[in-house]
């Protein structure tokens, strides 16, 4: 049955309960008629994939790292399918790591191919046509030169995949797109005397280009932006704490862009106080003018719950570096899920259990989204948010 039809039937059922209550002389609030009118996007909880683009290490690079840096290999030993498949299986937060490449070609010839050849290993397959990497525009990868295979390339192509899926499923809860701006701060290639590709620095003008690429794919009516959330308030922090985030009624079928790197926020805000005119929500310090979205990836449940109660949108990681997945340790996962973090990120979403232990991060009963365990209103109904996954 189509989800829109299911929601219509549920709405009719809620209407029926409302009328029965009226006949019985009760005075229920009119807001019970439609949860979309009352439930806000920070009052739900969804599962996200960490490094959603990550196609896994190429065979030669993997062998090389196993020999030289087994610890690094272990932390990178995971992969995801294409973005549409992830969305089909209930992932509602995607993470895309991007490198600026304003002239094109900066990442067209990765050092890893030379290192593999020098080690006498078979050449790795080319993950995408060279002309894609020669054109100007933001590129998607984990680490330049060694971990560069992605399920989509370039950044615009990844966004187009999300847009196509969203257009085909217009009733979805908002899709959160976390953007990690990779740069020189991310360090160098371990254990090599060879120079690796120096990333292009992030400047206000580079961020202008990033906003332009996003806007070239998503029209204003398909995004939730800082300006929309701020409204007439002076700051975003004031808006989310006093007035709240948009309701599901205003957010279905849309995307929200979030910035991963806290250091990039001040650069992104130059000339854009409180993110005026910008597309992404920064990973901000609570109480600051851009305060709306916060990352608490260490999984401190008390801190997360306090932030959620204050009105902030929080992303937290249930696992990292394949550590929990190798042992099946679910303690961090369970803390994060119960903390109220609206976005729970993992390398192992419901359809991708860890091959070592079966470790997985999923909402109960196959849910794609659930009412937030900390701040959801009484009007929130899990089955109203999105249909449960059939598998």
Model-derived features: positions:
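Positively charged, low-complexity intrinsically disordered regions
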Residues: 8-10, 28
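N-terminal secretory signal peptides that target proteins for export/translocation
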Residues: 1-8
């Amino acid at each position: 049955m189509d989800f829109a039809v299911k929601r219509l039937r549920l709405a009719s059922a809620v209407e029926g309960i409302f009328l029965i209550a009226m006949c019985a002389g009760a005075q229920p609030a009119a807001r019970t008629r439609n949860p979309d009118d009352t439930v806000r996007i920070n009052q739900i909880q969804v599962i996200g994939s960490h490094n959603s683009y990550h196609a896994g290490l190429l065979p030669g690079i993997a062998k090389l790292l196993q020999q030289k840096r087994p610890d690094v290999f272990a932390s990178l030993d995971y992969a995801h399918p294409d973005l549409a498949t992830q969305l089909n299986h209930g992932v509602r937060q995607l993470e895309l790591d991007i490198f600026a490449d304003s002239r094109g070609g900066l990442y067209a010839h990765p050092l890893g191919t030379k290192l593999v050849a020098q080690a006498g290993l078979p050449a790795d397959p080319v993950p995408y046509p060279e002309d894609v990497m020669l054109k100007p525009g933001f590129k998607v990868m984990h680490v330049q030169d060694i971990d560069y295979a992605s399920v989509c390339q370039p950044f615009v192509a990844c966004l187009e995949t999300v847009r196509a899926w969203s257009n085909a499923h217009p009733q979805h809860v908002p899709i959160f797109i976390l953007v990690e701006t990779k740069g020189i701060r991310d360090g160098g290639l371990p254990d090599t005397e060879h120079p690796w590709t120096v990333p292009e620095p992030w400047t206000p003008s580079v961020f202008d280009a990033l906003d332009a690429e996003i806007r070239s794919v998503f029209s204003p009516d398909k995004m939730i932006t800082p300006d929309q959330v701020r409204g007439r308030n002076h700051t975003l922090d004031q808006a989310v704490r006093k007035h709240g985030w948009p309701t599901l009624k205003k957010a279905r079928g849309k995307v929200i862009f979030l910035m991963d790197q806290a250091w990039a926020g001040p650069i992104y805000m130059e000339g854009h106080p409180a993110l005026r005119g910008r597309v992404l929500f920064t990973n901000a310090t609570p109480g600051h003018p851009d305060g709306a979205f916060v990352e608490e990836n260490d999984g401190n449940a008390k801190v997360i719950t306090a932030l959620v109660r204050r009105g902030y949108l929080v992303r937290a990681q249930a696992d990292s570096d394949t550590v929990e997945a190798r042992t099946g340790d679910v303690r961090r996962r369970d803390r994060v899920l119960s903390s109220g973090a609206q976005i729970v990120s993992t390398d192992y979403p419901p359809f991708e259990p860890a091959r070592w232990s079966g470790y997985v991060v999923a909402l109960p009963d196959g849910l794609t989204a659930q009412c937030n365990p900390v701040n959801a209103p009484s009007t929130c109904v899990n089955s109203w948010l999105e249909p449960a996954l059939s598998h």
